[in-house]
């Protein structure tokens, strides 16, 4: 049986929310709504950073960079259309 500690449970919840919200950001066409979703994702990263910052600092920073890249890619995609 898998023994889940508090930090691993937080990490699993974060990864689930991260994947779901990131997929929603890719599917949303309205830029205003997608900015709202990106804001929720960044807030999720900040909450994770406060709760388990030390072991996952590099992971959180890389996820933050992924969010910024997704915002840029989504804006470029909408600008082309």
From Swiss-Prot:
Record keywords: Early protein
Family that this chain belongs to: Belongs to the papillomaviridae E5 protein family.
Identification of the protein by name: Probable protein E5
UniProt organism field: Human papillomavirus 35
Gene: E5
